[in-house]
Amino acid sequence: MQITTIGLDLAKNVFQVHGVDATGQVVVRKSLRRAQMLPFFVKLPPCLVGIEACGTSHHWARELIKLGHEVRLMPPAYVKPYVKRGKTDAADAEAVCEAVTRPTMRFVPVKSPEQQAALSIHRTRDLLVKQRTQTINMIRGLLAEFGIDIPKGLERALLMARQIVDGKSPDVPIEAAKIVGTLSQQALDIHVRLREIDRDLAVWLRSNDVARRLMTIPGIGPVGATALAASVTDPHQFRSGRQFAAWLGLTPLQKSSGGKERLGRITKMGDKYLRKLLVVGMTALVRRARQNPEGDPRLADLLARKPTRVATVAMANKTARVIWAIMARGETYRTGHQPALAA
């Protein structure tokens, strides 16, 4: 009996394999150590390998593709319904093997090392931004206990902290001033690292054609363009711009039944980092439209009819569709083109 389909449950050191033949009969069910993984698959004829899209999955997918196997990654949430009972590595591998053969299953494209490297820059940048915010908020909270209110803005906060460290505020004890100095130096160090990361993203942007074309869209900056280009391996996996917007969680949640359509809030499913970047970018466009309604009359009209946040999400939905069109068709943004707003 020849193995045609394998379900592979990944882990750090011990991997579980569940293989079946063309009739669905179990041929192999075994665990492998990390060092045994590639030698095991080298001996097999080319077959279909299903893997949950989790940590290290893209690495192993690339390695197995080099050996001639067809590898398909699946979202873990879509594999879970095929687990019959209990939670074991063997049960998970069997569920993966069953799920990968379903004709309606949705798969995750395998990312290249370059894409994963770019995404690691974004993950690090997002972490450092959060840490910088936490540090500044810590300084604000500490000084508030001594009756000192720090103005908004990073530069103002660091300037005020420096004045306190230099002893220009006698109301702050020496011990507290030392802590403020430590925190302000940490915030400054993080800020310097963020500037370095932004320069790395600018270099990656110049070398990537897709990211450069996405930069032509209003509201999409270097961070958003590089994140989208690195996250979307194949735009043709989506049938339309609406499906791409749904993948980002920017479409209404449907609870329709009996022929009656019921739409709720946006689903907020998918990559929340990409969704956040889109919404933040559209927030800037909405703010500009409020200051200059003649610049975008249709957005100004939408703001007159809908709450600000609703209009912002509608713009993010519209922009997601434009992004898909540009990525799928290899075009750049046409300034005169005005697709319908999703209100």
What would you call each of these model-derived segments?
Residues 1-343:
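A detector of single, family-specific signature residues
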